[in-house]
């Protein structure tokens, strides 16, 4: 008998992510008095990072659309950044801060008798409970989406009478986007345009930016006596009457307006509505919305830590990606150092990862702001192509601002437009949204193709060539750059399916006359003549003829990336994973090519991929492993990636650094003042910041280890390690909901057509698969062919909308249905080698 969560009578899975995610709560058993250990809560548009200080709480508030535009005439019309104009740029500013102060060290580690801080994923709430020799304190906070209001309730008891203070403030600053190299020494930057006031018992701070007027408002409700006063133009405060017990509820929100007066009115109206609704009703609505969010999909892995990272990724995206603009790829809505935003622009290679997993997880709506950003930028993309590249079509610079304007440097990477176009097309393939195809995907696809057609030149060999481009971020240019060719091979056929006549002929002709892949021999730094000496394949034998891919030609000579010898000047190329671009982002190579010589070549290439410190936080190794079916290497390398890059206890990653300094930089770093060029030292620890790339990449890899549909087939469990249990409810391109469960007793898979149509399903290797067509409780057995060497392939030509196909290795009579299993809340911290989620408990409480 096999126990399965698929209900044969009701044709549904008894799998509930809302019931499972409590096991993945983020739990601190000891207080960590640092913003980098903060708890993020957000309504999708406004985010609040809550962290502990020895005598209270601090909350840093961000909103996705608080734009400070560059002063008119400073930057060029079609460029986002003009060299030499530091701090005169278009960037997002923070909203403000709230501090709650007590007259005692309530969160000092030395005085804790009992302590728990918890980020509850199921209901997206943060809570803190502390018991000390001089009193007790409890806090709960959540951010409700519909109202745009965040709510915090606090109860405290102290041995001595105390008079807590709650302060709302905003202290603007420089953006310091190039913190790692240079700064403009203007300490007064960002302080103008701020005003604080107290009206009708509420606190407000307004801010006039160049381009945005906004207000952050705070109200306190409770029966205690309190006073409200303005401290200065940047801050206003509540002071509670002295007493041994205190209890109050805070409501805060951030609103924009045509001017600061309108913004303040919008703020006050939202606070009044929230106060009338009340905390309990707001929480009930909030918890129900999150329950619905979680139950759109489901994942269970054998590795609990990786599963936790997956659900943390979804939590963060729903908390910060429902506003008008996509969050930044570093700190997103969780920055905590005034207006500091490292790498302030939208860097294409970095931000694309955040959205790649969402459609398969059933949450493609969270990528809409990203697609809007790119669609709205098309006029600027066309201008940049004409002005800088002297070509028709759309050119997306790797670095753009909110208008789509590209930087005035490093304009040789031609791939972003094609990548974005294919991301949009993939979204359409999941949703079937014809309006989106018409207004978003096809215009971007046509513009990207038009640009590439203008770049292609016919060589003496009769083939098309591209000259002088770079792969990904700027490096020394090459000819016939691999990343360009793979994006053309992915984009042109996808677009050609929607074209006719001459337009289609041009696309087909270009693809048919592209050079083949450049293959190169292994060198001494790669292997010892028998085994690899570097990378994840160290100690393994190369496959086939032992060749790998080149990345292009420089001065007529083929170029490879350096692996075992990273200082080798002949082959060095600074940005990783170029040779693996056929796997991702192009998606033109994968398990469909198994058994071919090129599959051996790609395997060799993958085996040379670095690990740990040789592997950046933005590399796509988990996705490559999944797309090559390497379940045997998947989990261990994902964990290795976390050990190298998860820099913070709340799951955010750092830039491959250790200690308190970002990116592994030294404690002090020499900077250049941008105008005087004077050198001076800065404590780099001040510039610690989150990065949000490793989590999304791991989430995409996890999904693709369970389900793939980018090759035109639905491939189930393609990279799950033999003997490991797993289960999922995920979505496939073409409009299918796919469920799968694998245990030691067998495997059950369902494919439900959401809008009608055919599909091909590739199942894990087995000769014992059975198939059943299920329509409204009826069941008809299907013929399933015997499996091949690697997998069993089943074709269903016509499935009606809502129709389900059941595939199982166990006879129906030997399946025993089990119900939804509710997980208990996570009791404590979790560890993955040298990194952890949360912090350990106190003695006697673990």
Regions found by a protein language model. Give the residues of each.
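Surface-exposed beta-strand/loop patches in extracellular or lumenal glycoproteins
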Residues: 162-171, 752-767
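Acidic/polar, glycine-enriched structural segments that form the non-catalytic walls/loops
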Residues: 2-36, 41-344, 363-364, 374-383, ...
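A conserved hydrophobic secondary-structure block that centers on an alpha-helix together
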Residues: 132-140, 144-149, 421, 426-443, ...
């Amino acid at each position: 008998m096999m126990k399965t969560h698929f209900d044969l009578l009701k044709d549904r899975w008894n799998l509930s992510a809302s019931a499972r995610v409590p096991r993945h709560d983020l739990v601190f058993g000891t207080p960590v008095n640092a913003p980098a250990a903060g708890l993020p809560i957000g309504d999708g548009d406004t985010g609040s990072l809550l962290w502990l200080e020895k005598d209270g709480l601090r909350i840093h508030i961000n909103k996705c659309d608080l734009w400070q535009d560059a002063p008119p005439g400073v930057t060029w019309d079609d460029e986002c950044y003009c060299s030499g104009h530091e701090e005169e740029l278009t960037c997002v500013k923070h909203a403000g801060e709230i501090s709650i102060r007590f007259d005692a060290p309530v969160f000092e580690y030395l005085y804790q008798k009992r302590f728990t801080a918890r980020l509850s994923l199921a209901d997206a709430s943060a809570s803190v409970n502390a018991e000390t020799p001089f009193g007790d304190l409890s806090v709960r906070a959540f951010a409700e989406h519909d109202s745009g209001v965040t709510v915090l309730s606090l109860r405290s008891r102290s041995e001595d009478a105390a008079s807590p203070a709650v302060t709302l403030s905003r202290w603007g600053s420089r953006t310091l986007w190039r913190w790692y190299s240079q700064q403009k020494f203007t300490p007064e930057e960002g302080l103008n345009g701020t005003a604080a006031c107290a009206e009708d018992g509420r606190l407000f701070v307004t801010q006039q930016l160049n381009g945005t007027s906004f207000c952050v408002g705070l109200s306190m409700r409770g029966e205690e006596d309190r006073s409200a006063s303005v401290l200065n133009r940047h801050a206003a405060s509540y002071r509670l009457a002295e007493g041994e017990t205190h209890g109050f509820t805070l409501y805060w929100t951030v609103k924009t307006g045509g001017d600061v007066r309108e913004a303040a009115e919008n703020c006050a109206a939202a606070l009044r509505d929230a106060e009338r609704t009340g905390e309990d009703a707001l929480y009930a609505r909030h918890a129900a919305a999150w329950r619905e969010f979680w139950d759109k999909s489901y994942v269970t892995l054998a590795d609990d830590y990786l599963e936790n990272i997956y659900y943390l990724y979804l939590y963060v995206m729903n908390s910060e990606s429902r506003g008008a603009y996509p969050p930044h790829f570093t700190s997103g809505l969780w920055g905590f150092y005034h207006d500091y935003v490292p790498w302030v622009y939208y860097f294409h290679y970095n931000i694309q990862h955040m959205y790649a997993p969402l459609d398969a997880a059933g949450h493609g709506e969270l990528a809409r702001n990203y697609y809007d950003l790119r669609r709205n930028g098309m006029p600027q993309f066309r201008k940049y192509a004409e002005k800088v590249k002297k070509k028709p079509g759309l050119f997306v610079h790797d670095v753009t601002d909110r208008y789509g304007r590209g930087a005035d440097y490093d304009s040789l990477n031609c791939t972003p437009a094609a990548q974005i176009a294919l991301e949009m097309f993939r979204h359409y393939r999941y949703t079937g949204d014809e309006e989106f195809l018409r207004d978003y995907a096809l215009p971007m696809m046509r513009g990207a193709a038009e640009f590439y057609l203008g770049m292609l030149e016919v060589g003496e060999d009769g083939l098309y060539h591209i000259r002088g481009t770079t792969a990904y971020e700027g490096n020394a240019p090459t000819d016939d750059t691999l990343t360009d060719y793979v994006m053309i091979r992915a984009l042109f056929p996808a677009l050609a399916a929607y074209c006719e006549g001459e337009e289609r002929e041009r696309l087909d002709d270009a693809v048919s006359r592209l050079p083949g892949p450049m293959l190169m021999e292994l060198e001494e730094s790669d292997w010892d003549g028998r085994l690899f000496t570097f990378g994840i394949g160290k100690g393994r034998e190369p496959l086939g003829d032992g060749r790998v891919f080149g990345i292009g030609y420089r001065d007529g000579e083929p170029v490879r990336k350096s692996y075992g010898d990273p200082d080798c000047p002949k082959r060095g190329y600074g940005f990783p994973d170029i040779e693996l671009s056929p796997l991702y982002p192009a998606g033109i190579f994968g398990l469909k090519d198994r058994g071919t010589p090129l599959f051996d070549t790609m395997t060799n290439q993958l085996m040379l991929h670095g690990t740990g410190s040789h592997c950046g936080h933005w590399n796509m190794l988990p996705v490559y492993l999944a797309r090559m079916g390497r379940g045997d290497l998947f989990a261990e390398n994902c964990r290795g990636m976390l050990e190298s890059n998860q820099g913070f206890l709340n799951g955010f990653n750092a830039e491959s650094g250790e200690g308190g300094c970002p990116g592994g930089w030294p404690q002090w770093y020499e900077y250049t003042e941008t105008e005087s060029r004077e050198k001076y030292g800065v404590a780099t620890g001040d510039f610690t910041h989150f990065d949000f790339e490793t989590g999304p990449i791991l989430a995409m890899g996890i999904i693709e280890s369970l389900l793939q549909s980018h090759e035109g087939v639905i491939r189930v469990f393609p990279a799950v390690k033999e003997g490991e249990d797993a289960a999922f409810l995920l979505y496939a391109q073409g409009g299918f909901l796919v469920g799968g469960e694998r245990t030691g007793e067998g495997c059950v898979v369902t494919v439900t057509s959401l809008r009608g149509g055919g599909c091909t399903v590739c199942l894990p290797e087995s000769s014992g698969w059975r198939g059943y067509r299920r329509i409204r409780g009826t069941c008809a057995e299907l013929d399933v062919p015997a499996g091949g060497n690697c997998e069993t392939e089943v074709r269903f030509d016509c499935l009606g909308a809502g129709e389900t196909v059941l595939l199982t290795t166990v006879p129906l009579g030997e399946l025993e249905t089990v119900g939804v299993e509710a997980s208990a809340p996570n009791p404590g911290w979790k560890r993955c080698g040298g990194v952890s989620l949360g912090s350990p408990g106190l003695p006697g409480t673990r």
